[in-house]
Amino acid sequence: MIVLLSACQSVEKNTKLIAGTFNTATNIQMKMLDRFAPPDVIVHNNIPYQASPELNVDIYQPKNIEQLNAMPTVVWIHGGGWVSGSKEHARGYFKLLANQGFNVVSVEYQFAPEAIYPTQLQQVDHALNFLQLNAAQYHINPNQLYLAGDSAGANIASHYAALLTNPTFAQVSNFKPSIQPKQLKGLILHCGIYDLYRFVNTAPEELRLIEWGVYNLVQAYTGERKEDAEFLKSISTSEHITPQYPSVFISGGNKDFLTKSQSLPFVEVLKQHQVAVTEAFYPDSKEFLVHEYQFMMSKQASQITFDRTIDFIKQTSRPTETK
């Protein structure tokens, strides 16, 4: 089935179809989240962090930012299967986070297949460098940074953290991070992908459309190297964890196939390397928690996850934190 479907159209055409579907869902999600957004959060839209191609960040801040000291900053990498999405996709959620006393920076990056791995990681690094250089202007504490992401964004965030904290991985990847490991206080990961080889080989076969989608997304992101098992393993976050990896807050829905195939195995890898992990999973919940459930703020589990995220940032940003 996969071969037949893929033979009908190119990866480029297929990913455009997938991106259109994802963007429709994203727009609905954005409008729903806007209902929960506090009205008086300060927003700086479309601040350029890279000139060619021009890419921007949005910065969300509490209304009393001028009276506050430099604050912890959550740098959010949006999802969309590496082929779609927008930095505005969860703006209501970012306002909720900012209203709790943090900076939130949402990063724009280029999409596959026009821009393939590792372009997105390089662009995240450029964004972090920009924030570091302009920290004073935006009340950012450059030593209290958090990388956050949902879905493919969680993949990018977790991968960047591995490059930052594993010098061998960075060297073989020819990657020189702009920040130091001690500056990254933690990761916030929702519904992510941490093992690309496993992602390709555990897509539910009974759901042919999902299997077809996984095939095309990975082909797009990797430059059509989906069949190269060793390459997929070599760029999987789970293969490069060390005890120096930052503290992790990780969540996934009870009806998201990625929870069982990606998030839970990743938690085990983190624990094997003595990485501090805060988990937010709800296997016994009666709520139907699908992919990206954390943005569905009308659900009790989503509210709990949000509250625990705030606690995670507060606890890990204390001066006594050593990671």
Where in this protein do the model-derived segments appear?
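Alpha/beta-hydrolase superfamily serine-hydrolase fold, recognizing
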Residues: C8-K323
